[in-house]
Amino acid sequence: MRIDGRKNEQIRHVKVTRHYTKYAEGSVYIEVGDTKVLCNVSIEDKVPPFMKGTGSGWITAEYNMLPRSTETRKIRDIARLKIDGRTMEIQRLIGRALRSVVDLKALGEKTLWIDCDVIQADGGTRTTAISGAFIALVDAVNKLHKIKPFKIYPIRSFVAAVSVGIVNEEKILDLCYQEDSKAKVDMNIIMTDEGSFVEVQGTGEESPYTRAELNELLDLGEKGIKQMINVQKESLKMDSLWIGTGGNN
């Protein structure tokens, strides 16, 4: 029996609140168990210097944990005058995950800024940020599409992320913090609704793991991705109909 009574192949309860803030073009407050993340998407009508003149857009992400998102106060990055390595790794991961399902050429020379702020952390903050940010991204892109329809709708597929791991020799899905801190193996999996992998990050925290264990964890992660994408689809409802069509229907 897991700490919160879940089955091994069950993700935590997910609650999504769209249009959470009024200024961002896309804004989602996502709660996965006790992990809570605010995901805002802002649109700029320009691209970074290295993209100028290419006709393509860009998606970049920033990730931040509020000081009391954790059990003890976390010092803000600005107070240290630098971004810590973990933060840099996670925001790059979020950016890569979202770019993987967007046709940047179809987007045009615009930058989509993804801001993910962790309000409360109980494991899986990066996976929660990716899954929530995708919904906010759809809302932001749809705003553009309704004002001036894209020739090719830029979002090609859904993308979501989950964690899996081995705890007490049990393979489990969507680890909370207590489970994560005891994990022999910890892995983050990002996939599309088409079953394609975007990224797999796996670490043997205490000991190496076998190819057979890796395969089992990937299968478990795929089950979790399907659950999370179902949540995304239920949240977006009719606003998800353009995804993957490439057209203006």
From Swiss-Prot:
It comes from Clostridium botulinum (strain Eklund 17B / Type B). SUPFAM superfamilies: Ribonuclease PH domain 2-like (SSF55666), Ribosomal protein S5 domain 2-like (SSF54211). Keywords: Nucleotidyltransferase, RNA-binding, rRNA processing, Transferase, tRNA processing, tRNA-binding. Gene3D superfamilies: GHMP Kinase, N-terminal domain. GO terms for molecular function: 3'-5'-RNA exonuclease activity; tRNA binding; tRNA nucleotidyltransferase activity. It comes from the Bacteria. Homohexameric ring arranged as a trimer of dimers. NCBIfam families: RNasePH (TIGR01966). Its EC number is 2.7.7.56. This is Ribonuclease PH. InterPro entries: ExoRNase_PH_dom1, ExoRNase_PH_dom2, ExoRNase_PH_dom2_sf, PNPase/RNase_PH_dom_sf, Ribosomal_Su5_D2-typ_SF, RNase_PH, RNase_PH_bac-type, RNase_PH_CS. Phosphate binds at residues 86, 124-126. It holds the Pfam family RNase_PH_C. The keyword Magnesium does not apply. Phosphorolytic 3'-5' exoribonuclease that plays an important role in tRNA 3'-end maturation. Removes nucleotide residues following the 3'-CCA terminus of tRNAs; can also add nucleotides to the ends of RNA molecules by using nucleoside diphosphates as substrates, but this may not be physiologically important. Probably plays a role in initiation of 16S rRNA degradation (leading to ribosome degradation) during starvation. Belongs to the RNase PH family. It catalyses: tRNA(n+1) + phosphate = tRNA(n) + a ribonucleoside 5'-diphosphate. PANTHER family: EXOSOME COMPLEX COMPONENT, EXOSOME COMPLEX COMPONENT RRP41. HAMAP family: RNase_PH (MF_00564). GO terms for biological process: rRNA catabolic process; rRNA processing; tRNA processing.
